[in-house]
Amino acid sequence: ESGAGNLELGAPNLTGLSESYISRQLSGFKAGWRDNRDLQTRTMTSAIATLDDASLSAAVAAIARLPHQKAKETAQTQSGDLARGKDLYTAYCSACHGTNGTGNDALGAPSLVGLDSDYMNRQYRHFVEGRRGFHPDDRYGKQMARLSLAVKDPNLIHDISSYVVQLPF
């Protein structure tokens, strides 16, 4: 309803994401661009499976109009090393996602601001494990999958997400 996500379901905050990114991701879910071994991906894939193009477009437009909100966080977020997370983010993420985390549509890089750390950690792991970015039509996903291999340690990934969640929006 609010688009700010649901931690219990593992659903991400959709507010603040660009219309083009939302459209690409929903189309990708429908086209099978993501490995659906996890409950969240299966849920999303089945939720949009029967939507026609007009319904998908209407959903994208409605999501894009939602006011930007910060996602709720868990206590685990505070456990990351923010200084190390900032250094890693600057070195490996900022060229595409921007120094302030707001993304770059021209590069296909979404805004990370407002996403919760659990979601970011899970999605990053999916790229590292080849569960995202494997489909030949997912140009930007393949790019992220290649780049994700630079940082594979779960503790370092957590440090990056801990840094990102504290960025202002």
Segments (PLM) and residue ranges:
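Axial heme c-ligation environment in periplasmic c-type cytochrome domains
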Residues: 7-13, 29-59, 63, 73-75, ...
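Short, electropositive, low-hydrophobicity segments enriched in small/polar residues
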Residues: 7-9, 20, 89, 102-107, ...
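Small disulfide-bonded, cysteine-rich extracellular recognition modules and tandem repeats
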Residues: 17, 47, 96-99, 115, ...
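Activation segment of ePK-like protein kinases, specifically the conserved APE
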Residues: 3, 34, 68, 101, ...
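Active-site substrate-binding loop specific to GH73 endo-beta-N-acetylglucosaminidase modules
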Residues: 26
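Sequence context surrounding c-type heme c attachment/ligation sites in exported
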Residues: 15, 19, 23, 86-90, ...
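Sequence/structural segment immediately N-terminal to covalent heme-attachment motifs in c-type
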Residues: 1-4, 77-102
